[in-house]
Amino acid sequence: MFQKILTILFGSKYERDLKRLNPIVETINSFEVTIKAMDDETLSSQTKKFKERLASGETLDDILPEAFATVREVAYRTLGMRHFDVQMMGGISLHWGNISEMKTGEGKTLTSTLPIYLNSLSGEGVHVVTVNDYLAKRDANWMRPVFEFLKVSVGVIQHDMDHEERKVAYNSDITYGTNNEFGFDYLRDNMVSYKEHRVQRQHNFAIVDEVDSILIDEARTPLIISGPAEESTDKYLKVNKIIPKLVEGEDFEIDEKAKNVILSEAGVHHVEKLLEVDNLYHAENIELVHHVQQALKAHKIFFKDKDYVVQDGEVIIVDEFTGRLMKGRRYSDGLHQSLEAKEGVPIARESQTLASITFQNYFRIYKKLAGMTGTADTEAEEFKKIYNLDVIVIPSNLKIQRQDMPDRVYKTEREKFDAVVKDIQEKVSRKQPVLVGTISIEKSEVLSKLLFSHGIQHNVLNAKQHERESEIVANAGKPGAITIATNMAGRGTDIVLGGAPKYKDDLEKLDDKCDSLGIKNKEELEIIYSFRECLIKQKFDEAEGKISDVRNETIKKECIKILGDAKKWKVDHDFVIGAGGLHIIGSERHESRRIDNQLRGRSGRQGDPGSSRFYLSLQDDLMRIFGSDRIARIMDTLKMPEGQELEHSMVSNAIARAQKRVEGHNFDIRKHLLEYDDVMNRQRIYIYGIRNELLDKGNMSKTVFDFFDEVVENQVILYCEGNNADAWEIDSLNEWLQSLGIDHKIESKDFKKESNPQLKVFEVVSKLVKELYDYKVSSIGDEIWRSIERNVFLDILDHRWKEHLYAMDHLKEGIWTVGYGEKNPLIEYKLQGFKMFDQLVDNLKNEVVSFLLKIEVTESDKKQDDTSPKEYKKIGQEQRAEVDMFGNELKSNKTKPQVSSTTSSGGGSERRSSRRKK
């Protein structure tokens, strides 16, 4: 209601956003003439000037217009690219800490240079987050000339970098990297033994590219660093043998919507007989029930060449959202081991958590967060509720010309694919490029075989062609190119009509060639620069005229070649535009409307023509699982002949309703995961706070003295309750003191005359404890003691935290059972988790106090100076683990270093990565 009133009075949100942005863009444009007149040296010195203004009290908002105008001019001089006004809007929105929704081809990477540069001026660092290493490196190198011209340093994090290389990258003003690398480096930084071994600085400002992919699609995959658990793998083989003997409908039912398998009462008895156990649900068999459940899912819910593939003796997960092979990623909770048993490959061991965090809680650490994507508006509610991010829709620079045609629905999958082939044949006849989106490797290969049988040449882009991904996508706009891609594989690489304009890459290399040939003549360099400008603006005749003035023969030949390539590309580009642009075929609807919109958005970039159509069948997963019975009955009633499609608003509405239901369900899962992780997050913040204080200060004597007071107080309350000294358990208190190495004997009679006996005994015991502590310090020496104290504290803290994480994992796995007792699992998890954490803190204090007071140091220990940082060592293995409604996640399963993740369809998937090189 409030939104309706707001719209009536002040216009739609989109209109209100534009009203805020337009005046700032006008101010930016007012600087253009002045800045354009600056020579390179003056323009480059703008950074120094801006930093001085910030130091004098101005804010980033104050200098935004001039800073943005500066970046625009530098980008034009270094890259030959000038920011459009709509890109300025996108940049302002990002600086404000919003999500800028910009359609495919609108130049998000160039747009990001504006807020990246502005926020780098604070000196606190900017993190630019991408979905993979290739894009991180590509974008950093692409935009590097802009930043380096302005004397701003750029670093890139790559998966195989060692510790020192990472440190250098993070100390740069701007750091590009993937969400996984940023997250894992954060966890590793909270596991180091010396502050010098940390790689990250503070978390100041992050811009997340493809923000919907990272903050929505991957939000169910916590980052986990784990170590191996001691557990046999035989049980997986034992359970796997009995699954083929169970009968669907009698022993179990399959719930495709929930991606679950439910064991019937008859099935329970059958399993008991096969496994030779008396009672499957006896306490000692709870783990066995879990393994049976996971084995059933492995056989009945997860399918080879759809959910995973088997390569080189390994089960490798196929990413649900991109169709890529996720090498090293593992399903969690024993599901991956069950799949390994099913496929007859070696079974890896399970593991336990050493450190973990969800993407939701990692990215909420940043002081300011922003994101870019072509499709965010459908998830605006989730971005606001979870991340407090507003979505601002940025207008396109040119009007979108793409025609989105109605869906065509067929009764069977065979009829649907026949129709897809006919559509492709029709486009092939006029050499119009086609991109076909499929939801799995299996479907892409079925369609590929069908096209080959009709003699249609094409490229297939799925996990098996991962290495050629960018090349295939870049050339998907060539005349007559037919490309089949799983989901959104290749996202981040624009499909340019006419194919990739490679001549632009060669053009960029001209400067380097001139340098290598020693060309320094100013007049000749200006001619080459003019040639470059003409080519960028596609003024080919003028460019040809410039070539004749080039004196160096090597450069002249290179210019002739580049011009020839540019002309050929222009012919292809114009031909494809005349043929109707890129045609998109969706071979199935995805669960999320956003993923469908991403596929459509590959066509019609920057005002180009294009078209799209989805082909569906009643056998598609979305239609089959979420209710296509009514549509099927109508098709039967109408006696529709084979091959006849159905186009009706009722069909479109049914699909939209199904997608909204699934989106709502997935949002609930992500929200639920966050509610569970918030419990751990509060605990994590407390432990990491103590840890960082320990590393940064080194001297923990004040904290230790606080621990003394709390531990002594607890012991006094335990053994000396109330002020009646005769009722005290004074012998127990003395035994505790003796266990610490304090021989002083306390007598209850000494306190009877005190007005507050309990307070007095606390003071006496506290004094005894601190005297022993002071004696230890003085006898060993302050410097050596501080080092010992720090190491003892750190060692105990890390061990207790690791044990606590293990216990919390088990609590999470078993908490669902309280639902049968009509209790709320989340509330029970919070209550029990708080009690366990409270116990952890008490144990930590007791153990630190006890260890420090009992410690004995030899002469050789005194001679060792342990204050200098040791060599950096990486601990544990990295994982990504998706979770179920109760947040159950991890259990990666290799003893060697790795990374993991899940689909909350029951198991979790885990993604592995190698250790940092030493």
Swiss-Prot record:
Keywords tagged on the record: ATP-binding, Cell inner membrane, Cell membrane, Cytoplasm, Membrane, Nucleotide-binding, Protein transport, Translocase, Translocation, Transport
SUPFAM superfamilies: Helical scaffold and wing domains of SecA, P-loop containing nucleoside triphosphate hydrolases, Pre-protein crosslinking domain of SecA
GO cellular component, one term: cell envelope Sec protein transport complex
GO biological process: intracellular protein transmembrane transport; protein import; protein targeting; protein transport by the Sec complex
Stretches the record annotates as Disordered: 863-918
Biased composition (Basic and acidic residues): 863-883
Source organism, top-level taxon: Bacteria
Keyword NAD annotated: no
InterPro entries: Helicase_ATP-bd, P-loop_NTPase, SecA, SecA_CS, SecA_DEAD, SecA_motor_DEAD, SecA_preprotein_X-link_dom, SecA_SF2_C
Transport among keywords: yes
Primary localization: membrane
Task of the protein: Part of the Sec protein translocase complex. Interacts with the SecYEG preprotein conducting channel. Has a central role in coupling the hydrolysis of ATP to the transfer of proteins into and across the cell membrane, serving as an ATP-driven molecular motor driving the stepwise translocation of polypeptide chains across the membrane.
Family from the record: Belongs to the SecA family.
NCBIfam families tied to this protein: PRK12904.1, secA
Protein name, per record: Protein translocase subunit SecA
Organism (species): Leptospira biflexa serovar Patoc (strain Patoc 1 / ATCC 23582 / Paris)
